[in-house]
């Protein structure tokens, strides 16, 4: 439930490339617009609401974080196995989702010098994943595979948090060299004539949450807080860049309205893998460009909902148990 804090046993401690804490922003209002005071100036302040900004978790893509971000942003999660664990994740549908248009919620603990003289020690309750972005780049190292998740929260919090954080977990991270399957709309970019032509990719998910203020939504410190995050018109976007060569079929697929599956897989080892299977992809835009002096095409995919298989299926194997369960 949105107002239920996580227990310490379910808290996962991890690193974040975003060094800023998640800010709390209480909003006050005044009586400036009211007449009858004898002047135009404000005379009183009133508590209004917590206007909590979105917060970005930015990380090198690991099996653990990908499983977490996909699970909490899409909502329909099935876990199987016993170390490693396999998560099969698809977008929840309002007609069958037990919580309607709401996704699973989590708590966020942030601490600076915890203990008797803590600078910051609080737990934000009722957080949700607004969206994520997966970026694959033509570069070496961990930065070649990045994932960020944009999170929102209601304004409810507990301070001090009452949480003793566990030891930091060791992530099992991917890089672009670990891509083991890369076929978009019938074009295999790992083997055959299109091998070695793939440059980069960005995939993103956006839940477009509706405002969560309503009668009875709740209050903290006398300020109104949000009481739900319901998804709006969700958006799934994929863009990728490939080198142009003689006989490239991307333009033909665009003009002929050709659709097909798209499979993207990263494999670190038997215990850590990530697969994004788009059930029906077409090409919306194919734009000529230049990448490091090489002629390239930037392809904007359009992901279509298939009546049998849905839109996208994420299959993730990771040692981390109990995500979104």
Residue map of PLM features:
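Signature of extracytoplasmic/envelope-associated structural regions
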Residues: 1-325
